[in-house]
């Protein structure tokens, strides 16, 4: 019930202050609330919300649970998934410890370096990890970054993407994950330091060092370059997990050169020319190989966890097409269902799609492009027609560039009626 004094003056139903004592009085059905009580309620709700976030972080899934969820989205890469699950679990366990400097032991951050061929699942793994832990996630492309003062993006813009992903909640952003892709493209052009300035290579590596290790960075709220007269967002990167990834084309020859036996003289063994696949070579990677490739020692030192991904074979690509929760075939079947059409893809067609992706050396990333190309004309036609019952992707659609097989409702219905009659007779 609304509250009045003797002079019929309006009062807040919660604190009893009169209309003259507050800035604003908001009316409801027979009740009033002042701006001060609204602010107090907001503070109480925010405190409860912050506590719930802390509780969520304390309920961190175990490495085996993280891997089980990764298995639902990412096919193969068993060792990589285990290594990532352990690294992410340890990182957030470190954050959850109330006093990380208890005693003489300081728990330091372990950022992750992921190496693997194009389309092997680096980005998908990082995205899925962020979903599992329920933290803000941002992807940045290392090729667009340049050293401060040059044309291109400053490294602080990476942090802005994370802040935006957290809806400008700085506290949440400070516990997020940033994935920096194409990090191999910022390798310096030669192993020896150059006299000329390498603003998109070594310069970017130098600029990334501080935020990788942990610092309070000043981020321009609108992005772009910094200038002296603007306000900055302050963000502490100490608890942000950085995952950097790249294909590192050519590093296999560096590893092969280091691991192959060499000797001289008449009794010398001939240099072993054992041909190993890319995945097997990457498993033998050492920090010295990364230095030879063009990463600077300080940068390598800030990425203690190295995870290698294998090249996806035909069987793995077929599984990627059919098995994950968001598998490509499931996505297209759903798209066709919306238009009232059933989609079927023959086993041999799936195998040929996988082979084509291997030939193009695009890995899992190239699968969508191949499938899209096969079905483009059919998907263009279906919404304009209501007589199509089923579309079948055959092997000929891939090998001979034929159109997928279309079954009309008038052809399918008589067969179904005949089958039902036979079953009823028997």
UniProtKB/Swiss-Prot annotation:
One of its GO terms (biological process) is cell division. Zn(2+) binds at residues 12, 15, 34, 37. Pfam families: AAA_2, ClpB_D2-small, zf-C4_ClpX. The keyword Nucleotide-binding applies. InterPro entries: AAA+_ATPase, ATP-dep_Clp_protease_ClpX, ATPase_AAA_core, Clp_ATPase_C, Clp_protease_ATP-bd_su_ClpX, ClpX_bact, P-loop_NTPase, Znf_CppX_C4. SMART domains: AAA (SM00382), ClpB_D2-small (SM01086), zf-C4_ClpX (SM00994). ATP binds at residues 117-124. SUPFAM superfamilies: Glucocorticoid receptor-like (DNA-binding domain), P-loop containing nucleoside triphosphate hydrolases. Keywords: ATP-binding, Chaperone, Metal-binding, Nucleotide-binding, Zinc. The keyword Chaperone applies. Residues 1-53 form the ClpX-type ZB domain. GO terms for cellular component: HslUV protease complex. One of its GO terms (molecular function) is ATP-dependent protein folding chaperone. Component of the ClpX-ClpP complex. Forms a hexameric ring that, in the presence of ATP, binds to fourteen ClpP subunits assembled into a disk-like structure with a central cavity, resembling the structure of eukaryotic proteasomes. Belongs to the ClpX chaperone family. ATP-dependent specificity component of the Clp protease. It directs the protease to specific substrates. Can perform chaperone functions in the absence of ClpP. NCBIfam families: clpX, PRK05342.1. This is ATP-dependent Clp protease ATP-binding subunit ClpX. It comes from Alkaliphilus oremlandii (strain OhILAs). The lineage of its organism: Bacteria, Bacillati, Bacillota, Clostridia, Peptostreptococcales. The gene is clpX.
